[in-house]
């Protein structure tokens, strides 16, 4: 005990000292590898939770990796010792909060990775101390809000990755002081991007990712559409797909016109004009002192423009560009793309970031993938949507191993043969929407280990076989909306860490929680609207599961379609007892007032045990356990009872009404059955015995009329208990002519060694009893005839008839002699002495 106390106190003292003193060299705890004079410090999975306790490495510049540790909260000055770090990886730490000043001291930091954590907000003081940051990655978090001024100090920030979060809007002027060239906001909740305050500050961007947001294609999206139409062709901008209103659902924003977006005419036309640098109002000041002004003009009287304005040499016709924008565009246009073949009916362009080829074959009336000749080299993106492709063969993608995106949407594909995509190991996005696929099976997606986004909406899918998505361990987004699905197989999502799931507008009447929905452990968004939900007992489990989800995960509330009384009523507004009246039908005592129903729920849903139905397994196991415990307890009680009963001393029986039981005596006499002989020895010989006091026993209850009764004894002898009065009568009839012989009497009493041993054992055993005796009775053993003859031959004749009453004191001497073997010479001497008498 003292040892444990000593260890605990020592640990507390050491932890207290560690808070203020740096005692461990980081390279002694982590792995340090130098590559081309650059040190890489890998502290992944080494249980580090206080980096400020580590000494910095000796190198001038180094990369720090603290992934997969216990950094749940970053306190101020956490990395103050690592002033020469150029990159810091903090991914996969379940990081929930970053306090202001946590990055103080990282003045040389260029890259910061905060991906795959649980951050919910980026505050204005989150990035204090890292003003030289150029690359910030914060994807796959739970970020909902970004405070104004969060990036104001990051003047050199060029790459910002915020995809797959819960961001619904961007605050005004959030990017005003940053120099962004790459912005990724995919997979969020953004419905609109205003020009003023957001788009006007990202004029330097060369890559903008907009996919997988619920874009509201209304008048609010006209600024984004106008801005996209005026961007140079060599700038990569992801597709913005309309989600609302319903008549534009699934449409690309660039394919819509202004009349469709804003039919009422309010703000029906927008035009982005870049004004001369002479105007300073609301301008952006460049490092050389010039200010570029961008304003937004609304020309209500102007008729709608076409959605495809002509572009000459990357500059919008009729638009004037500032020197800054012009020089930037020219720099990208002067870059010589690699010589690569492009299929005849398609249009190819080189991606500016990695020089990968983007092949655009949209709406070229292509009947088969075999028409794409010559096959492009180093293709990263392949758009074949809007054609007439019906079948996809195994050999169609043999030369597209480097694809990152494959768009086969809006075709007439009915059959996809197995292992068609097996060689597309780098594919991250696959579009199969808008086809006529009816059935999904595992072989279709074989080989797509890195696939993250799968679009299967607007098909005729009726059945999905078990294990279909198991070959995609990185799948995060799955769109199955607008199909004909009625059910899903068990464990269909167990092999895919889905974050976003869309099952809207199918034929689901209910969805099981057990084995299906409970497998969605990383869910951030789910859409179940537009299904004919049957609001009965089968939907109670789904309702309980939805109630446990965090706010914002469910896109829209579910509405009942059947039964009729619940039509168009939101599921969450109905109580469980109303959905399932069986929950109220439980046996209970009679009460005059209604009592609230108690519903026992589990993660699998409510437990309903109808009368006569099977007993739940949990109750059965509990019952068996109770029975076993009771059985062991009863057996233990019986064992204790038996042991205690055996240890108790023999209970003395109380007297049976006879007051003489306490004075009963036990005497030994020999009784010969052959009384017809005249020999005096044949009658009886008295040997005085000590009166043994006995406890009260059952013999006390004998009637006075009973003079004796027999007990079983060793073979050849009988034990007879006689009354003391009978004994006295027998003594009166003793032959007076008989001579007294002590030896004779002893021999007659103990005719053999066995008898002697018996008496000796008997005398020794009497110590175990306290006052054992029977008052008024004697014990007699009949003598054997053969022993009698042997004694006569030894002694030589009959003795005189003398009765000697031994005194009580002589008994002890006789007793001592009986316990030892008799001497033959002594016997002869005593015999001679007696004969003389």
Swiss-Prot record:
LRR repeats lie at residues 60-81, 84-105, 108-129, 132-153, 156-177, 179-200, 378-399, 402-423, 426-447, 450-471, 474-495, 497-518. Glycans are attached at residues 81, 325, 423. GO terms for biological process: axonogenesis; behavioral fear response; cell population proliferation; long-term synaptic potentiation; memory; positive regulation of synapse assembly; smoothened signaling pathway. Residues 1-18 form the signal peptide. Residues 19-618 are extracellular. Residues 213-264, 531-582 form the LRRCT domain. The chain crosses the membrane at residues 619-639. It comes from the Eukaryota. It is a single-pass type I membrane protein. Keywords: Cell membrane, Glycoprotein, Leucine-rich repeat, Membrane, Repeat, Signal, Transmembrane, Transmembrane helix. Residues 640-837 are cytoplasmic. It is found in: Membrane; Cell membrane. Coiled coil: none annotated. In the adult, significant expression is detected only in the brain. Broadly expressed in embryonic brain with highest expression in subventricular zone, subplate, cortical plate, pyramidal cell layer of hippocampus, thalamus and hypothalamus. SMART domains: LRR_SD22, LRR_TYP, LRRCT. Residues 333-375 form the LRRNT domain. One of its GO terms (cellular component) is membrane. Belongs to the SLITRK family. Interacts (via LRR 1 and 2 repeats) with PTPRD (via extracellular domain). It is involved in synaptogenesis and promotes synapse differentiation. Suppresses neurite outgrowth. This is SLIT and NTRK-like protein 4. The gene is Slitrk4.
């Amino acid at each position: 005990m003292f040892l444990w106390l000593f260890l605990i106190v020592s640990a507390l003292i050491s932890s207290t000292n560690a808070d203020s003193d740096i005692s461990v060299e980081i390279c002694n705890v982590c792995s340090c590898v130098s590559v081309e004079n650059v040190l890489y410090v890998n502290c992944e999975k080494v249980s580090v939770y206080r980096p400020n306790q580590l000494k910095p490495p000796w190198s001038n510049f180094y990369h720090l990796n603290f992934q997969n540790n216990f950094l749940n909260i970053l306190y101020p000055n956490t990395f103050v010792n690592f002033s020469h770090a150029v990159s810091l990886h903090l991914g996969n730490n379940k990081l929930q909060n970053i306090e202001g000043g946590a990055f103080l001291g990282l003045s040389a930091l260029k890259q910061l990775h905060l991906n795959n954590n649980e951050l919910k907000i980026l505050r204005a003081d989150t990035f204090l101390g890292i003003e030289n940051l150029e690359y910030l990655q914060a994807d796959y978090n739970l970020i909902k809000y970004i405070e104004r001024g969060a990036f104001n100090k990051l003047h050199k920030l060029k790459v910002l990755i915020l995809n797959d979060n819960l961001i619904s809007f961007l605050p005004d002027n959030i990017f005003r002081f940053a120099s962004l060239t790459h912005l990724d906001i995919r997979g969020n909740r953004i419905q609109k991007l205003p020009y003023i305050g957001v788009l006007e500050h990202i004029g330097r961007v060369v890559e903008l990712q907009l996919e997988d947001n619920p874009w509201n294609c209304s008048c609010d999206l006209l600024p984004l559409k106008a801005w996209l139409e005026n961007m140079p062709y060599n700038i990569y901008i992801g597709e913005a797909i309309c989600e609302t209103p319903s008549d534009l659902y699934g449409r690309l924003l660039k394919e819509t016109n202004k009349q469709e977006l804003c039919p009422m005419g309010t703000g029906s036309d927008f035009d982005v004009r870049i004004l001369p640098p002479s105007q300073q109002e609301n301008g952006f000041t460049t490092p050389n002192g010039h200010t570029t002004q961008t304003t937004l003009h609304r020309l209500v009287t102007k008729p709608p423009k076409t959605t495809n304005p002509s572009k000459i040499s990357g500059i919008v016709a009729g638009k004037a560009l500032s020197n800054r924008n012009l020089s930037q565009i020219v720099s990208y246009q002067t870059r010589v793309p690699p010589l690569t073949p492009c299929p005849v009916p398609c249009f190819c362009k080189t991606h500016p970031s990695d020089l990968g080829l983007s092949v655009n074959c949209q709406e070229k009336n292509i009947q088969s993938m075999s028409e794409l000749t010559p096959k492009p080299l180093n293709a990263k993106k392949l758009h074949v949507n809007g054609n007439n492709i019906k079948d996809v063969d195994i050999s169609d993608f043999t030369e597209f191993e480097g694809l990152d995106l494959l768009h086969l949407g809006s075709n007439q594909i009915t059959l996809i043969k197995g292992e068609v995509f097996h060689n597309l190991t780098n594919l991250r996005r696959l579009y199969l929407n808008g086809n006529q696929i009816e059935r999904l099976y595992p072989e279709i997606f074989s080989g797509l280990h890195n696939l993250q986004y799968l679009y299967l909406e607007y098909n005729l899918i009726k059945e999905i076989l078990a294990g279909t998505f198991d070959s995609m361990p990185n799948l995060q987004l799955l769109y199955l909306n607008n199909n004909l699905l009625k059910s899903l197989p068990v464990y269909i999502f167990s092999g895919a860490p889905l974050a976003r799931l869309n099952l809207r507008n199918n034929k689901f009447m209910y969805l099981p929680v057990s084995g299906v929905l409970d497998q969605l452990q990383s869910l951030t968004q789910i859409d179940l609207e537009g299904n004919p939900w049957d609001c009965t007992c089968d939907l109670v489990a789904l309702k309980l599961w939805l109630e446990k989800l965090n706010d914002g995960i469910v896109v829209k509330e579910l509405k009942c379609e059947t039964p009729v009384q619940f039509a168009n009523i939101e599921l969450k507004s109905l109580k469980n007892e109303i959905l399932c009246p069986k929950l109220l039908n439980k046996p209970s005592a009679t009460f005059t007032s209604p009592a609230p129903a108690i519903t026992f729920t589990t993660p699998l849903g409510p437990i309903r045990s109808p009368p006569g139905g099977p007993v739940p397994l949990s109750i059965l196991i509990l019952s068996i356990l109770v029975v076993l415990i009771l059985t062991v307890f009863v057996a233990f009680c019986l064992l204790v009872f038996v042991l205690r009963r055996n240890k108790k001393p023999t209970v003395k029986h109380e007297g049976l009404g006879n007051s003489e039981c306490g004075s009963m005596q036990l005497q030994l006499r020999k009784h010969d059955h052959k009384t017809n002989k005249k020999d005096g020895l044949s009658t009886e010989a008295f040997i005085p015995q000590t009166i043994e006091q006995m406890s009260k026993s059952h013999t006390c209850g004998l009637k006075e009329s009973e003079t004796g009764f027999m007990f079983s004894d060793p073979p050849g002898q009988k034990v007879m208990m006689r009354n003391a009065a009978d004994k006295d009568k027998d003594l009166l009839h003793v032959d007076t002519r008989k001579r007294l012989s002590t030896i004779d009497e002893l021999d007659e009493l103990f005719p053999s060694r066995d008898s002697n041993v018996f008496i000796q054992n008997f005398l020794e055993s009497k110590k175990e009893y306290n006052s054992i005796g029977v008052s008024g009775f004697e014990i007699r053993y009949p003598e054997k005839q053969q022993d009698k003859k042997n004694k006569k031959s030894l002694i030589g004749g009959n003795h005189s008839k003398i009765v000697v009453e031994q005194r009580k004191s002589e008994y002890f001497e006789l007793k001592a002699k009986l316990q030892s073997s008799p001497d033959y010479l002594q016997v002869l001497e005593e015999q001679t002495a007696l004969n003389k008498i």
